[in-house]
Amino acid sequence: MSMKISVALAQVTQRQFTDDLSGYAEEIEKILSRFPETQMVVHPELHLFGSDMSTDALSDIAQSLDGKFVGELGEIAKRFGIWLIPGSIVEPAPNSEVYNTALVFNPAGELVSFYRKIFPWRPSEPFTMGSEFSVFELPGLGRVGLNICYDIWFPEVTRQLTWMGAELIVNLVRTTTPDRKQELVLVQASAIVNQVYILSVNAAGPIAMGRSLVVDPDGDVVEQILDDSNSIIYTIIDFDRVAQIRRDGTAGVNRMWDQFLPNDPEINLPIYSGRINPRTWRPGMNR
């Protein structure tokens, strides 16, 4: 049985917000006409919500998870029979605040997962923090974790997602600043130390810096866009590759998830008021 999924990462310019999603459906249709074998389409952070990051503007266009807008995104996924990650949306939060929330729809159009960005880029972003990590199942293939943009600067996020069983992590990005160069290093390092695939899809110019990429669980960059152009990465994710790297080791030598022996002592982590327990140090321990 194949353990692979074909994914199209759309590095494209952000769309201005509208509750008419016909233009977005046409955008997906064009991707699928170019890459008809695509099983999953991924767009960048806030792809459908324009570039105005003022609190008032975001509050005016915030969309609830059970509302018409999100429902229509599900209908688009169902229409094309694909897994769809349409970037993130602006979602209402308590006290008149807003979340930056990634959505995942299955080919039946069901909202199967969502993730509220835990690390907004302060002080520039007005979003309130999420508080829960998100990993979802691709039936018969593997598990996928979600993070958004600045989350990649915090290694705890990727480590937690991997511990929750993620073999593929989708990093939705709208980086408009020169530190995209450093983010590329962080994406590669995060894939290496967790032995996971990472798909990092940034928006295109003129707003964002582009340079989307795919890194495999050995840390190799297998696909990348070298500029901020409107471009598509079409890639195949092989979940067997994750198992192989974890079994044989990164570069054939490093097996971080097999580091501990059964009787090793716990390691206190005062920074987190917690600890590493050698008996639970492996991916998927809380599945």
Task: Locate predicted features.
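CN hydrolase (nitrilase-like) catalytic-core segments centered on the catalytic cysteine
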Residues: 65-83, 152-233
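Active-site catalytic loop in hydrolytic enzyme cores
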Residues: 93-167, 173-185, 189, 247-251
